[in-house]
A protein has these predicted regions:
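N-terminal small/polar loop signature for handling phosphorylated ligands or for N-terminal nucleophile
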Residues: 2-74, 166-228
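Gly/Ser/Thr-enriched, mixed-charge loops and adjacent short helices
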Residues: 75-207
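Phosphate-binding and adjacent anionic-ligand microenvironments
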Residues: 252-431, 436-456
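Short glycine-rich phosphate-binding loop at a beta-alpha junction
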Residues: 4-14, 150-152, 255-261, 304
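Short glycine-centered, acidic/aromatic-flanked micro-motifs in structured strand/loop junctions
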Residues: 11-13, 81, 153-155, 229, ...
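A short, gly/pro- and small-residue-rich
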Residues: 72-99, 228-244, 318-329
Length: 456
């Protein structure tokens, strides 16, 4: 175990307005303990973890200052050790320690120790970009492996602009039409979020208008990404899961893909029947799916991919790090390989069926004890389906690891819904997909059931 003075911690941030002041405060705190601080400046979250991996840095830990896609007035910290991102139990312990310290105590410690650690500027993003470039060169071949490809990048004014400028362009890609590459914490163009409707419409337009072979879009801190093919088809939600899995299917036949709970039945059919993989539909929360995949591997079950429909994709080959730029790089490689063969990215997902309609509705729980009350509602719903569901062609899905998932199959509608508790808010999100009829047919059933409860 190292002493504090032997530790080296990297600190980076996204484009948020409060980033610099928070970085300064973090640096003062670390240096007061004698810790060496590597100032990485504008960074992506995955690059900060990689500062613990790259030999030229080998940091003992990393702190990323970001609030992902949340509103511009929010900010926060993501913590990494060499083993990966800290879990909620670790975060709870950090908060407990912080709550036990007063400002006076901290100032006294600072003066007493007088052990200022060094601050060093670190080009982690440059090293990280080089790492991604080498990955493309190795798998596509040549010094300009992307020559002849037009790839549009939408960074949403977050930290992802480097991908167009420092990864794609130096390898010969035409990045004409790329947009919002400049970091701007006001996020003036659209929410930097691959799940956001306006954001996806924006990158789709850019691909079509610029006749691009591929479009890529990142969230603020680049731990998530989605794509658009040359036809303007969105590759997000279920489709980004399918794409991420298809990219490794030949190398890892039969591997288990762990996803969050709101994936479609059509995705399961694609993964299992078209790709020959196994699908474990687990829980929302990217740490949940990553930890489940790690657990499977520890128990002798091969799992090469943990991914959320939000665009968090973590490959075993990449330290189970949810890395939007790494996923984007694998998609770029596949696009380049297909281009050489005279094909486009659309062939990869040609067998993936899309639902006729998909919606999400969120119910507010109007109770102070919303967590317990929400669980009671879910238990009652499960009992109701078991008791009366057969009358309307409704049946419980099993196994199921989060909320209550119900299949509907009757004359009017064929589809499914999932009612679950929100990870953080007093809400009950309802996800609905149908291949026949309308989502409103299923929503009506859930609305009628919830009428007896204190929700709105």
């Amino acid at each position: 175990q190292k002493s504090e003075k032997e530790l080296k911690i990297s600190v980076g941030h996204d484009s948020r307005i409060t980033a610099e002041s928070l970085k300064e405060a973090v640096g003062i705190g670390l240096r007061s303990l004698g810790i060496t601080v590597l100032d990485c400046g504008l960074s992506s979250t995955p690059a900060m973890f990689m500062s613990t991996v790259f030999e030229e840095y080998r940091c003992d830990g990393a702190i990323m200052i970001t609030a992902s896609h949340l509103p511009k007035d929010r900010n926060g910290f993501k913590y990494f050790s060499r083993e990966g991102g800290l879990d909620k139990e670790d975060i709870a312990q950090i908060i407990k320690i912080a709550e036990g310290l007063s400002l006076e105590e901290l100032q006294a410690q600072y003066k007493e120790k007088n052990a200022l650690g060094q601050v060093k500027q670190a080009g982690v993003m440059s090293t990280y970009a080089s790492y991604l470039r080498e990955m493309i060169k190795k798998q596509v071949g040549g010094d300009n492996p992307l020559e002849g490809l037009r790839i549009v990048v939408d960074a949403g004014n977050g930290a992802g602009g480097f991908y167009a400028l420092d990864v794609l362009k130096p390898l010969g890609a035409d990045i004409t039409g790329s947009q919002f590459l400049e970091p701007d914490g006001n996020f003036p163009n659209h929410q930097p979020n691959p799940e956001n409707k306006e954001a996806m419409e924006s990158i789709c337009r850019a691909v079509i208008e610029n006749k691009a072979d591929l479009g890529l879009i990142f969230d603020t801190d680049v731990d998530r990404s989605s794509a658009v093919d040359a036809s303007g088809r969105e590759i997000n939600r279920n489709a980004i899961v399918a794409m991420a899995a298809a990219l490794i299917a030949k190398d890892f036949p039969g591997t288990t893909v762990v996803t969050d709970s709101i994936t479609s039945d059509q995705l399961t059919e694609y993964l299992e029947n078209c790709l020959g993989l196994k699908h474990l539909r687990f829980k929302r929360g990217y740490k949940n799916v990553i930890n489940k995949a790690k657990e499977l591997n520890q128990n002798g079950v091969d799992s090469q991919l943990a991914i959320e429909t939000s665009g968090h994709a973590a490959y075993k080959e990449n330290y189970f790090l949810d890395d939007g730029a790494y996923l984007a790089t694998k998609i770029v490689i596949k696009t380049a390989q297909l281009k050489k063969a005279g094909a486009g990215l659309d062939v990869v997902l040609s067998s993936l069926e899309e639902p006729k309609e998909a919606i999400e509705k969120r119910f507010s729980i109007n109770r102070a004890d919303f967590a317990d009350y929400g669980q009671e509602i879910l238990c009652r719903l499960e009992e109701w389906v078991e008791r009366e569901g057969q009358q309307i062609g409704a049946s419980l899905v099993s196994p199921n690891y989060e909320g209550v998932r119900i299949n509907f199959d009757n004359e009017q509608v064929k589809g499914w819904c999932l009612l679950r508790k929100s990870l953080h808010d007093p809400k009950l999100p309802l996800n609905v997909e149908v291949t026949k009829g309308s989502c409103s047919d299923i929503v009506r059933v859930i609305d009628e059931f919830l009428a007896d409860f204190d929700v709105s």
